[in-house]
Design a protein with these regions (language model features):
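Substrate-engagement module of ASCE P-loop NTPases
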Residues: 169-171, 342-348, 352, 384-399
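Loop/turn-to-beta-strand initiation segments
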Residues: 175-179, 316-319, 361-365, 394-399
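Helical/strand "switch-coupling" subdomains that flank nucleotide/phosphate-binding cores, especially
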Residues: 203-304, 314-319
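Conserved P-loop NTPase motor module
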Residues: 334, 451-515
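Glycine-rich phosphate-binding loop of nucleotide-binding enzymes
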Residues: 120-212, 410, 439, 457, ...
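Basic- and hydrophobic-enriched, low-structure N-terminal and domain-boundary segments
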Residues: 1-153, 160-161, 165, 172, ...
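Conserved helicase/translocase P-loop NTPase motor core
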Residues: 299-364, 375-378, 382
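Conserved ATP-driven motor cores of ASCE-family P-loop NTPases powering translocation/secretion/packaging/pilus
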Residues: 388-466
Length: 515
């Protein structure tokens, strides 16, 4: 049931102002419906509110001091809202005109949610309407390759939003899969965000692959690094260094990095010059400095690469969570870029050479925390710029997560068709969002005042306006999920295990006595 909020008092272009009824709750960003004539309605978002008085200044002062009381019409509140949709005889589209003076303004109901088609397969939360919540709101699977951005200051609820989105990818496997780079090590166990993470998802054991530097599962053998991969490993590397690497590779084969490092340690720059037939000292020292910086833990002398296992898992619809906390920022950069390149290029090759098999691959979303470090226009370009700009047709999507949207390359930002905007306090970032994101021209105040767990959701072309959303708390989501029965045999009791241990120890003692 819709609540009567007030009536229109003025209209200009796409902005309306309406009187707010007494004792009505309203919030910045709330969506309201304006019922007009001829079975026509308009939808608008609240962007500003003002309290005013009809009294003269002297009368206001006397009223403030309690010396005089005036009637109920001595003060009023008017609300500014921006039109974004029109409904005419059941058909919803962008506004072709605007409402009339004194048209009624009402709150949304569940029927409005249905007409606005806000629920996608990947449910993120519920629509906020004043102090109430309405139907579910979500992102469609088709929106994943159109790229996503999650923006908000630290503590605004980004990690919870990441968990919710990736949990939905797991739920929709094998149709969808995720590649998640966790910089802070929070997503597995939910550290500092409630104590539950993706490891608590009912499908974790058969739908998620976990890789961590702490468990030494992030290994990329030096013999898998051909010269072509150097631009991925070291963005901004010059052509002369690549040419030198290619000469070393031709002479030494797959062990070129190991043997070149040995020669350089023993003979220095002259040894490399003789080996490659290349005498530029500056180029040799620059390349060898980079190669010597590859640590033996992450880059052992072998032909094994965990990236191959990641590609295999994702191809089967298994989401891969890569914990890169606890290693240096440079090592994080290496792991992230090499892994994302390997997976994205697999999708590209399949599309080009095995189209029928490509059609069976899950739609992929790569979640990249600290995205501004990889998408800054003032830094060398990485694979993530290419993914955002050109990999849509391969069904590879990027989820750029960052507290600093203003540091993202504008060309990349324009390709993020789905945006989840949480509380943002830095004015530079709010200005960037309101100037570069559609439907947010008047939303600076609203973005600043969002509460923890609240967001504005835009997901073109399905959701062509900013929807006020309360993101579902991940712990609540887990509570509602059914446990999965893996049909495993029941565990033995501790007493039975102790008896077996005593029996084995007794047998061992008898054996030693005979010996």
């Amino acid at each position: 049931m819709s609540e009567d909020l007030g009536s229109v008092c003025s209209v200009k272009g796409d902005r309306i102002t309406f009187f707010l009824n007494k004792r009505v709750n309203l919030t910045f960003g709330q969506i309201v419906r304006v019922d007009s004539k001829n079975n026509q309605s308009f939808y608008a978002r609240v962007v500003n509110a003002e309290s005013r008085s009809t009294l003269e200044t002297g009368e206001q002062l006397r009223e403030a001091e309690g010396k005089e009381t005036f009637g109920p019409y001595s003060s009023y509140k008017n609300i500014d809202a921006v039109l974004f949709l029109e409904m005419n005889h059941g058909r919803v589209r962008s506004p072709t005109f605007n409402p009339n003076y004194m048209d009624k303004v009402v709150s949304l109901n569940k029927e409005d949610s249905r007409l606005l088609r806000l629920e996608g397969q990947l449910v993120m939360g519920v629509v906020r309407s004043g102090g109430q919540t309405l139907d579910n709101v979500g992102i469609s699977i088709d929106a994943l390759p159109r790229m996503i951005g999650m923006f908000g200051m630290t503590g605004s609820g980004k990690t919870n939003t990441e968990l919710m989105l990736n949990a939905q990818l797991i739920d929709n496997s094998p149709r969808t899969a995720g590649l998640i780079f966790d910089f802070a090590g929070q997503l597995l166990d939910g550290k500092e965000i409630g104590g539950k993470g993706l490891s608590n998802h009912p499908l974790f054991h058969n739908k998620v692959g976990f890789y961590s530097a702490k468990e030494e599962r992030l290994r990329i053998g030096l013999r898998t690094l051909v010269p072509l991969k150097l631009s991925t490993l070291f963005p901004g590397i010059g052509y002369p260094q690549y040419r030198l690497a290619n000469e070393l590779y031709k002479k030494l084969g797959s062990r070129w990095i190991e043997e070149a490092r040995e020669v350089y340690v023993v003979k220095g720059q002259k040894g490399i010059a003789e080996l490659a037939g290349y005498s530029n000292r500056t180029v040799i020292e620059a390349l060898m400095s980079r190669l010597l910086g590859l640590g033996t833990v992450l880059f052992p002398a072998s032909d094994y690469s965990f990236v191959d296992n990641v590609v295999q898992n994702i191809s089967k619809g298994i989401t891969c969570l890569i914990d890169i906390s606890g290693i240096t920022s440079e090592e994080q950069h290496h792991i992230v870029c090499l892994t994302a390149t390997g997976v994205a290029n697999h999708y590209k090759r399949m599309w080009e050479k095995r189209y029928e098999q490509w059609q069976k691959l899950p739609t992929l979303l790569i979640t990249l925390e600290e995205a501004h470090e990889f998408l800054d226009p003032n830094r060398p370009k990485t694979i993530f710029s290419a993914i955002a700009l050109t990999y849509r047709k391969y069904r590879v999507g990027l989820n750029a997560v960052t507290p600093r949207p203003s540091r993202i390359n504008p060309d990349v930002f324009a390709e993020l068709w789905t945006k989840m905007i949480m509380k943002t306090e830095l004015k530079a970032d709010r200005d960037y969002l309101t100037k570069n994101a559609p439907y947010l021209e008047y939303s600076d105040t609203e973005i600043k005042m969002l509460d923890i767990g609240e967001a504005l959701l835009i997901s073109e072309p399905k959701i062509r306006f900013a929807v006020p959303v309360r993101i579902t708390h991940y712990l609540e989501y887990l509570d509602k999920k059914e446990k999965v029965d893996y049909n495993l045999p029941s565990s033995k009791t501790l007493e039975a295990l102790d008896e077996n241990l005593e029996r084995l120890q007794s047998i061992s003692k008898d054996s030693n006595a005979r010996a």
